[in-house]
Amino acid sequence: MSETARTTIDQSEVDRFSAMAAEWWDPTGKFRPLHKFNPVRLAYIRDKVCEQFGRDPKSPQPLKGLRLLDIGCGGGLLSEPMARMGADVLGADASEKNIGIARTHAAGSGVNVDYRAVTAEALAEAGESFDIVLNMEVVEHVADVDFFMTTCAHMVRPGGLMFVATINRTLKAAALAIFAAENVLRWLPRGTHQYEKLVRPEELEKPLEASGMQVTDRTGVFFNPLANQWNLSKDMDVNYMIVAKRPL
Protein backbone atom coordinates (compact mmCIF):
# COMPACT_ATOMS: atom_id res chain seq x y z
CA MET A 1 0.00 0.00 0.00
CA SER A 2 1.43 3.39 -0.90
CA GLU A 3 2.01 5.93 1.86
CA THR A 4 -0.44 8.35 0.25
CA ALA A 5 -3.17 5.69 0.25
CA ARG A 6 -2.81 4.85 3.93
CA THR A 7 -5.37 6.18 6.37
CA THR A 8 -5.74 6.31 10.13
CA ILE A 9 -9.53 6.43 9.92
CA ASP A 10 -11.75 3.51 10.90
CA GLN A 11 -15.12 4.73 9.64
CA SER A 12 -17.10 2.40 11.90
CA GLU A 13 -15.40 4.00 14.92
CA VAL A 14 -16.10 7.51 13.60
CA ASP A 15 -19.76 6.58 13.12
CA ARG A 16 -19.99 5.09 16.63
CA PHE A 17 -18.72 8.24 18.32
CA SER A 18 -20.69 10.53 16.02
CA ALA A 19 -23.87 8.79 17.17
CA MET A 20 -23.03 9.68 20.79
CA ALA A 21 -21.77 13.21 20.10
CA ALA A 22 -24.58 15.00 21.93
CA GLU A 23 -23.50 13.36 25.21
CA TRP A 24 -19.87 14.51 25.30
CA TRP A 25 -20.41 17.10 28.03
CA ASP A 26 -22.87 15.09 30.15
CA PRO A 27 -20.86 13.91 33.20
CA THR A 28 -23.47 11.22 33.88
CA GLY A 29 -23.83 10.06 30.27
CA LYS A 30 -21.95 7.71 27.96
CA PHE A 31 -18.69 9.62 28.45
CA ARG A 32 -18.85 9.55 32.26
CA PRO A 33 -15.59 7.53 32.50
CA LEU A 34 -13.70 10.23 30.60
CA HIS A 35 -15.08 12.94 32.89
CA LYS A 36 -13.83 10.89 35.86
CA PHE A 37 -10.50 10.30 34.11
CA ASN A 38 -9.91 13.97 33.29
CA PRO A 39 -8.40 15.20 36.60
CA VAL A 40 -5.59 12.63 36.71
CA ARG A 41 -4.65 12.96 33.05
CA LEU A 42 -4.81 16.78 33.12
CA ALA A 43 -2.48 16.87 36.13
CA TYR A 44 -0.12 14.37 34.50
CA ILE A 45 0.06 16.34 31.25
CA ARG A 46 0.53 19.66 33.06
CA ASP A 47 3.31 18.35 35.30
CA LYS A 48 5.25 16.65 32.48
CA VAL A 49 4.93 19.70 30.21
CA CYS A 50 6.11 22.03 32.98
CA GLU A 51 9.04 19.71 33.69
CA GLN A 52 10.06 19.68 30.02
CA PHE A 53 9.59 23.38 29.30
CA GLY A 54 10.69 24.78 32.67
CA ARG A 55 7.26 26.09 33.67
CA ASP A 56 5.63 26.54 37.07
CA PRO A 57 2.77 24.02 37.41
CA LYS A 58 1.12 26.29 40.00
CA SER A 59 0.93 29.16 37.53
CA PRO A 60 -2.62 30.04 36.34
CA GLN A 61 -1.50 29.48 32.72
CA PRO A 62 1.53 27.16 32.79
CA LEU A 63 1.12 26.24 29.10
CA LYS A 64 1.02 29.83 27.84
CA GLY A 65 2.66 30.23 24.43
CA LEU A 66 2.83 26.50 23.68
CA ARG A 67 1.06 25.13 20.61
CA LEU A 68 -0.89 21.96 21.34
CA LEU A 69 -2.67 19.40 19.15
CA ASP A 70 -5.46 17.34 20.71
CA ILE A 71 -5.96 14.65 18.07
CA GLY A 72 -9.24 12.74 18.31
CA CYS A 73 -10.50 15.55 20.54
CA GLY A 74 -14.14 14.42 20.56
CA GLY A 75 -16.27 17.06 22.24
CA GLY A 76 -13.26 18.90 23.67
CA LEU A 77 -12.98 17.44 27.18
CA LEU A 78 -9.20 17.91 27.07
CA SER A 79 -8.96 20.76 24.57
CA GLU A 80 -10.84 23.25 26.74
CA PRO A 81 -8.80 22.73 29.94
CA MET A 82 -5.58 22.88 27.91
CA ALA A 83 -6.69 26.22 26.44
CA ARG A 84 -7.52 27.49 29.93
CA MET A 85 -3.96 26.60 30.93
CA GLY A 86 -2.79 29.00 28.24
CA ALA A 87 -2.00 26.65 25.36
CA ASP A 88 -2.76 27.56 21.75
CA VAL A 89 -4.97 24.53 21.06
CA LEU A 90 -5.93 22.85 17.81
CA GLY A 91 -8.60 20.23 18.47
CA ALA A 92 -8.89 17.75 15.60
CA ASP A 93 -11.41 14.98 15.07
CA ALA A 94 -12.57 12.95 12.08
CA SER A 95 -16.21 13.38 13.14
CA GLU A 96 -17.98 16.54 11.97
CA LYS A 97 -20.59 15.96 14.69
CA ASN A 98 -17.98 15.84 17.43
CA ILE A 99 -16.40 19.05 16.16
CA GLY A 100 -19.81 20.73 16.03
CA ILE A 101 -20.47 19.85 19.67
CA ALA A 102 -16.97 20.98 20.66
CA ARG A 103 -17.32 24.34 18.91
CA THR A 104 -20.71 25.01 20.47
CA HIS A 105 -19.52 24.18 23.98
CA ALA A 106 -16.35 26.26 23.65
CA ALA A 107 -18.35 29.24 22.42
CA GLY A 108 -20.66 28.96 25.43
CA SER A 109 -17.71 28.61 27.80
CA GLY A 110 -15.75 31.54 26.41
CA VAL A 111 -12.78 29.31 25.57
CA ASN A 112 -10.78 29.83 22.40
CA VAL A 113 -9.96 26.55 20.64
CA ASP A 114 -9.30 26.04 16.93
CA TYR A 115 -11.52 23.02 16.21
CA ARG A 116 -11.18 21.28 12.86
CA ALA A 117 -12.80 18.19 11.33
CA VAL A 118 -9.54 16.84 9.94
CA THR A 119 -7.31 13.76 10.10
CA ALA A 120 -3.81 13.47 11.54
CA GLU A 121 -2.39 12.71 8.11
CA ALA A 122 -4.00 15.82 6.58
CA LEU A 123 -2.47 18.00 9.30
CA ALA A 124 0.94 16.42 8.79
CA GLU A 125 0.73 16.86 5.02
CA ALA A 126 -0.11 20.54 5.58
CA GLY A 127 3.14 20.93 7.53
CA GLU A 128 1.54 21.60 10.92
CA SER A 129 3.84 21.33 13.96
CA PHE A 130 3.28 21.47 17.71
CA ASP A 131 5.07 21.69 21.04
CA ILE A 132 2.63 19.15 22.49
CA VAL A 133 0.62 16.40 20.79
CA LEU A 134 -2.08 14.58 22.77
CA ASN A 135 -3.23 11.12 21.69
CA MET A 136 -5.54 10.34 24.59
CA GLU A 137 -7.84 7.32 24.32
CA VAL A 138 -7.53 7.40 20.53
CA VAL A 139 -5.10 4.73 19.31
CA GLU A 140 -7.50 1.87 20.10
CA HIS A 141 -9.96 3.41 17.64
CA VAL A 142 -7.72 4.06 14.62
CA ALA A 143 -7.25 1.87 11.54
CA ASP A 144 -3.43 1.80 11.34
CA VAL A 145 -1.63 2.31 14.65
CA ASP A 146 1.92 2.39 13.24
CA PHE A 147 1.00 4.96 10.60
CA PHE A 148 -0.96 7.01 13.12
CA MET A 149 1.91 7.12 15.62
CA THR A 150 4.47 7.93 12.92
CA THR A 151 2.26 10.65 11.45
CA CYS A 152 1.68 12.29 14.83
CA ALA A 153 5.35 11.99 15.81
CA HIS A 154 6.36 13.93 12.72
CA MET A 155 4.30 16.89 13.95
CA VAL A 156 6.17 17.16 17.28
CA ARG A 157 8.66 20.03 17.26
CA PRO A 158 12.23 19.55 18.54
CA GLY A 159 12.04 19.66 22.33
CA GLY A 160 8.33 18.88 22.18
CA LEU A 161 6.28 16.10 23.77
CA MET A 162 3.70 13.52 22.74
CA PHE A 163 1.32 11.96 25.26
CA VAL A 164 -0.47 8.68 24.56
CA ALA A 165 -3.16 7.12 26.75
CA THR A 166 -4.87 3.85 25.92
CA ILE A 167 -5.74 0.34 27.14
CA ASN A 168 -3.29 -2.55 27.18
CA ARG A 169 -4.04 -5.76 25.26
CA THR A 170 -4.06 -8.17 28.19
CA LEU A 171 -6.56 -10.63 29.60
CA LYS A 172 -6.83 -8.41 32.67
CA ALA A 173 -7.82 -5.48 30.45
CA ALA A 174 -10.32 -7.64 28.58
CA ALA A 175 -11.91 -8.60 31.90
CA LEU A 176 -11.96 -5.13 33.46
CA ALA A 177 -11.95 -2.52 30.69
CA ILE A 178 -14.25 -4.39 28.32
CA PHE A 179 -16.36 -7.06 30.03
CA ALA A 180 -16.83 -5.37 33.41
CA ALA A 181 -16.93 -1.76 32.18
CA GLU A 182 -19.28 -2.43 29.25
CA ASN A 183 -21.38 -5.41 30.34
CA VAL A 184 -21.48 -5.42 34.15
CA LEU A 185 -21.01 -1.85 35.36
CA ARG A 186 -22.38 -0.35 32.12
CA TRP A 187 -19.89 2.53 32.32
CA LEU A 188 -19.51 2.39 28.54
CA PRO A 189 -21.83 1.32 25.70
CA ARG A 190 -21.23 -2.24 24.55
CA GLY A 191 -18.82 -2.38 21.65
CA THR A 192 -16.88 0.74 22.66
CA HIS A 193 -13.68 -1.31 22.74
CA GLN A 194 -12.65 -4.43 20.83
CA TYR A 195 -9.94 -6.61 22.35
CA GLU A 196 -8.05 -7.08 19.09
CA LYS A 197 -7.71 -3.29 18.70
CA LEU A 198 -6.16 -2.76 22.12
CA VAL A 199 -2.48 -1.82 21.98
CA ARG A 200 0.50 -2.92 24.06
CA PRO A 201 3.03 -0.29 25.17
CA GLU A 202 5.83 -1.72 23.04
CA GLU A 203 3.59 -1.50 19.96
CA LEU A 204 3.37 2.26 20.51
CA GLU A 205 6.98 2.78 21.50
CA LYS A 206 8.43 1.02 18.43
CA PRO A 207 7.01 3.44 15.80
CA LEU A 208 7.70 6.41 18.09
CA GLU A 209 11.35 5.48 18.47
CA ALA A 210 11.62 4.75 14.74
CA SER A 211 10.39 8.32 14.19
CA GLY A 212 13.17 9.76 16.33
CA MET A 213 11.18 10.14 19.56
CA GLN A 214 12.48 9.13 22.99
CA VAL A 215 10.10 7.58 25.52
CA THR A 216 10.64 9.43 28.80
CA ASP A 217 7.87 8.13 31.05
CA ARG A 218 5.31 5.36 31.38
CA THR A 219 2.59 5.02 33.99
CA GLY A 220 -0.41 2.89 34.68
CA VAL A 221 -3.75 4.39 35.67
CA PHE A 222 -6.36 2.63 37.80
CA PHE A 223 -9.82 3.41 39.09
CA ASN A 224 -10.28 3.39 42.86
CA PRO A 225 -13.99 2.60 43.44
CA LEU A 226 -13.81 3.54 47.13
CA ALA A 227 -12.51 7.03 46.37
CA ASN A 228 -14.48 7.16 43.10
CA GLN A 229 -11.44 8.51 41.26
CA TRP A 230 -8.59 7.56 38.93
CA ASN A 231 -5.01 7.46 40.22
CA LEU A 232 -1.58 6.86 38.72
CA SER A 233 -0.18 3.37 39.29
CA LYS A 234 2.83 1.18 38.50
CA ASP A 235 0.40 -1.37 37.07
CA MET A 236 0.15 -0.88 33.29
CA ASP A 237 -1.91 -4.03 32.65
CA VAL A 238 -5.13 -2.12 31.92
CA ASN A 239 -5.02 1.66 31.40
CA TYR A 240 -1.68 3.33 30.83
CA MET A 241 -0.04 6.53 29.57
CA ILE A 242 3.25 7.12 27.75
CA VAL A 243 5.25 10.32 27.25
CA ALA A 244 7.79 10.71 24.44
CA LYS A 245 9.92 13.70 23.48
CA ARG A 246 11.63 14.78 20.29
CA PRO A 247 15.25 15.67 21.10
CA LEU A 248 16.48 19.18 20.33
Swiss-Prot record:
Catalytic activity: a 3-demethylubiquinol + S-adenosyl-L-methionine = a ubiquinol + S-adenosyl-L-homocysteine + H(+); a 3-(all-trans-polyprenyl)benzene-1,2-diol + S-adenosyl-L-methionine = a 2-methoxy-6-(all-trans-polyprenyl)phenol + S-adenosyl-L-homocysteine + H(+)
Pathway(s) served: Cofactor biosynthesis; ubiquinone biosynthesis
EC code: 2.1.1.222, 2.1.1.64
Record: residues binding S-adenosyl-L-methionine: R41, G72, D93, M136
GO molecular function: 2-polyprenyl-6-hydroxyphenol methylase activity; 3-demethylubiquinol 3-O-methyltransferase activity; polyprenyldihydroxybenzoate methyltransferase activity
Keywords: Methyltransferase, S-adenosyl-L-methionine, Transferase, Ubiquinone biosynthesis
Function text: O-methyltransferase that catalyzes the 2 O-methylation steps in the ubiquinone biosynthetic pathway.
Name of the featured protein: Ubiquinone biosynthesis O-methyltransferase
Protein's organism: Sinorhizobium fredii (strain NBRC 101917 / NGR234)
Taxon lineage: Bacteria, Pseudomonadati, Pseudomonadota, Alphaproteobacteria, Hyphomicrobiales
